């Protein structure tokens, strides 16, 4: 499909949503003359902000809200689905052709792509890569699963500067001929098992980031490569990375030891790092800078000054010398475990707020932090039921609350000066919140109102 053919096609947008992706997709098509049917199970009231952002194109849009109509799927030339819609959705079987915003973007994009996926750490890594690459490539752009559709800046692309894309497994699922110049898999944990039939399907979707790559390099965590990805054939050079202790086998590998970065045993540079939770994205960024011949001294400064990004182990404020951290983006147990370990104090003064909606995961990894967490504060939810079973099995005391407000107030009440209150739910958010970002914002508002 060519850009000037868009005006001759009828598109059905399945899922307008509230996070901007559906709006960016719609505006991209509408500006090029397309006629749209936009359908979403949410109501007009719920979607008011997104609908308002499309007011300039009212004569080109027909809305079907609160339901889906099978005839709209039959009549559309192309159905563009939200990545979160499962491919076996009953309405999609009537579609002539199915795309996503990412697959549409890739049809027309000419910029080289640095692609990042992984269960956790994607957003932190792409944010660091963006800062580092900007030093050499002023036209670099950042988009994808981080909350910015690349279609929103399509008209600003210069055809030559790197484009950094954060991609979830859902977004990769529909990309059959994806060909970045650098692909990166940060890690793999059991996640989204409420979406996938099995873990193997999840791995297959993750592998689509590199299986059709024809140039450049693939960067994969050594443990993930050993367990899951070595069976997939790569046409390009595979380079592994390790946080501290690399796997013992014959493969290109880089790793970090006390701030010093080594590639195949040779020191390539160093940077200072005080927070263990950011070590993996930092060492990957350092190596990518090395590979792209970016000034490593400047990259080291960027890494040393990095304070994190919103909702990922974000320091909110200190209230009466009690430090509050917002880690709402930790939606799986392993991520919460890593966050707790990174904030570990000598006298174990972490009061952990955890719990939420189940994603068909287990919480056995919580045993690794049982002796680090001082107080377990739980928010009621379907995942919380599983957490309670783990804690009770180990005879660990916990305190259960019906709301985030009550949990925050209790955490503050029991905390002494020097304590840490960490909100790291290890669960999805949908029983009490719109999404994890809404959950994080509510937490920060509650903390800011404490004093």
From Swiss-Prot:
GO BP annotation list: cell division; cell wall organization; peptidoglycan biosynthetic process; regulation of cell shape
Keyword terms: ATP-binding, Cell cycle, Cell division, Cell shape, Cell wall biogenesis/degradation, Cytoplasm, Ligase, Nucleotide-binding, Peptidoglycan synthesis
A Gene Ontology molecular function term of the record: UDP-N-acetylmuramoylalanine-D-glutamate ligase activity
Subcellular location(s) of the protein: Cytoplasm
Main location as per UniProt: cytoplasm
Reaction it catalyzes: UDP-N-acetyl-alpha-D-muramoyl-L-alanine + D-glutamate + ATP = UDP-N-acetyl-alpha-D-muramoyl-L-alanyl-D-glutamate + ADP + phosphate + H(+)
Gene Ontology, cellular component aspect: cytoplasm
A Pfam family recorded for this sequence: MurD-like_N
Binding residues annotated for ATP, in chain numbering: 118-124
Enzyme Commission numbers on file: 6.3.2.9
UniProt cross-references to InterPro entries, sorted A to Z: Mur-like_cat_sf, Mur_ligase_C, Mur_ligase_C_dom_sf, Mur_ligase_cen, MurD
Pathway per the UniProt entry: Cell wall biogenesis; peptidoglycan biosynthesis
Family of the protein in this entry: Belongs to the MurCDEF family.
Role, per record: Cell wall formation. Catalyzes the addition of glutamate to the nucleotide precursor UDP-N-acetylmuramoyl-L-alanine (UMA).
PANTHER family membership: UDP-N-ACETYLMURAMOYLALANINE--D-GLUTAMATE LIGASE
Protein name: UDP-N-acetylmuramoylalanine--D-glutamate ligase
Gene transcribed to yield this protein: murD
């Amino acid at each position: 499909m060519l850009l000037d053919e868009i005006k001759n096609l009828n598109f059905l947008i399945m899922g307008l949503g509230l996070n901007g992706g559906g709006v960016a997709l719609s505006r991209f098509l509408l500006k090029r003359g397309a006629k749209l049917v936009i359908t979403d199970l949410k109501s007009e009231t719920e979607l008011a902000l997104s609908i308002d952002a499309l007011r300039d194109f009212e004569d080109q849009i027909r809305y079907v809200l609160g339901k889906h109509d099978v005839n709209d799927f039959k009549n559309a030339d192309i159905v563009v689905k939200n990545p979160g819609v499962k491919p076996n959705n009953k309405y999609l079987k009537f579609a002539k052709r199915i795309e996503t915003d990412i697959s549409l973007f890739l049809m027309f994009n000419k910029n080289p792509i640095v692609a990042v996926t992984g269960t956790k750490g994607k957003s932190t890594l792409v944010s660091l890569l963006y800062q580092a690459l900007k030093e050499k490539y002023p036209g670099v752009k950042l988009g994808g699963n981080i909350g910015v559709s690349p279609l929103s800046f399509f008209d600003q692309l210069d055809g030559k500067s790197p484009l950094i894309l954060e991609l979830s497994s859902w977004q990769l699922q529909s990309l059959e001929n994806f060909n970045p110049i650098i692909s990166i898999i940060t890690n793999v944990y059991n996640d989204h098992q409420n979406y996938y039939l099995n873990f193997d399907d999840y791995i297959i979707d993750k592998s689509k980031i590199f299986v059709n790559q024809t140039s450049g390099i693939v960067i994969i965590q050594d443990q993930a490569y050993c367990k899951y990805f070595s069976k997939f054939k790569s046409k390009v050079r595979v380079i592994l990375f390790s946080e501290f202790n690399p796997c013992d086998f014959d493969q290109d590998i880089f790793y970090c030891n006390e701030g010093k970065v080594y590639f195949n045993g040779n020191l390539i540079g160093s940077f200072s790092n005080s927070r263990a939770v950011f070590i993996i994205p930092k060492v990957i960024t350092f190596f990518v800078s090395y590979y792209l011949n970016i000034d490593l001294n400047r990259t080291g400064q960027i890494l040393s000054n990095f304070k994190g990004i919103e909702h990922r182990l974000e320091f909110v404020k200190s209230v009466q010398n009690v430090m509050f951290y917002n880690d709402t983006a930790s939606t799986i147990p392993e991520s919460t475990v890593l966050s707790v370990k990174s904030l570990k104090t000598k006298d174990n003064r972490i009061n952990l707020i955890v719990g939420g909606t189940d994603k068909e995961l287990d919480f056995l990894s919580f045993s690794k932090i049982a002796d680090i967490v001082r107080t377990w504060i739980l928010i009621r939810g379907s995942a919380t039921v599983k957490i309670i079973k783990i804690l009770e099995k180990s005879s660990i005391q916990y305190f259960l609350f019906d709301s985030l407000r009550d949990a925050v107030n209790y955490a503050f009440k029991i905390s002494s000066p020097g304590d840490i209150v960490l909100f790291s739910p290890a669960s999805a958010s949908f029983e009490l919140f719109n999404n994890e970002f809404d959950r994080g914002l509510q937490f920060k508002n509650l903390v800011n109102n404490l004093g």
